[in-house]
């Protein structure tokens, strides 16, 4: 098996052509011609993940977030990105990321959020091409809920310890917009689409001042997207059922954000 065989299969699920212009999805370290004997799937490409891959005999790491996102001027072993790059190269581990490519397919990040909330009539929030790909999604709750009810519902479905929210609506909520990861820039669009609730992450302070009849929730960047790791693994095992594909055993400790006082 070659690296290119694995990445080609992932790109059927999440095509590189749909990534955002600022993104760096794709093969980041290694060659499509490199031989691969095992794949390790994680969320962020950290030195710890590379070490885990090597210990498992994996020579390809697949993550959601790209290891190299913007241009870098130096590779420093004291920096987490630099350390991961050096460790991957020294160990002969190829590194691949499916970032906004996985955000923009309905079977990916936002679609997983919708399925977790059992939304009905789900469609792409920011449709592109023929309407089958794009950022975010929007759908209807099975049962209308007040703001406090939906807060409890989301907390339970996503297994959250905390949610940052604007003032909970007292009127029934039916239409919900979702965007995994940093979605603060799409708040106005969610409102324009008729959503009464918008669930995303990385919302800035002033965006919690919402107009009447609209509510936002910030459930955390990691928490909103982490299910994509299981989706990647399922895709690989479906296409290569006898190949060694692993999910990182450290996912429970992978979130770089730590919550205290809960």
Regions found by a protein language model. Give the residues of each.
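Active-site catalytic microenvironments in core metabolic enzymes, especially phosphate/sugar-handling
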Residues: 1-262
């Amino acid at each position: 098996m070659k690296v290119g065989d694995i990445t080609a299969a992932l790109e059927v699920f999440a095509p590189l052509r749909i990534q955002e212009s600022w993104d760096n999805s794709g093969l980041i370290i290694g060659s499509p011609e490199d031989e691969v004997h095992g794949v390790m799937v994680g969320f962020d490409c950290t030195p710890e993940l590379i070490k885990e891959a090597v210990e498992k005999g994996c020579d390809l790491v697949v993550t959601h977030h790209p290891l190299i996102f913007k241009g870098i001027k130096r590779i420093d072993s004291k920096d987490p990105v630099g350390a991961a790059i050096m460790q991957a190269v020294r160990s002969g581990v190829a590194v691949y990321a499916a970032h906004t490519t996985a955000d923009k397919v309905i079977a990916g990040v936002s679609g997983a959020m919708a399925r977790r909330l059992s939304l009905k009539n789900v469609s792409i929030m920011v449709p592109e091409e023929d309407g089958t790909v794009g950022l975010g999604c929007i759908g209807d709750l099975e049962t209308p809920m007040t703001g406090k009810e939906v807060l409890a519902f989301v907390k339970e479905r996503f297994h959250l310890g905390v949610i940052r929210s604007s003032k909970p609506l007292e009127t029934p909520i039916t239409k919900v917009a979702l965007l995994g990861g940093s979605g603060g820039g799409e708040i106005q669009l969610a409102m324009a689409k008729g959503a009464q609730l918008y669930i995303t992450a990385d919302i800035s302070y002033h965006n919690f001042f919402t107009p009447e009849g609209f509510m936002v929730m910030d459930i955390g960047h990691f928490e909103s997207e982490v299910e994509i790791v299981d989706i990647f693994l399922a895709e690989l095992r479906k296409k290569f059922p006898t190949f060694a594909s692993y999910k990182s055993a450290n996912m429970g400790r992978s979130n770089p954000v730590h919550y205290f006082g809960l």
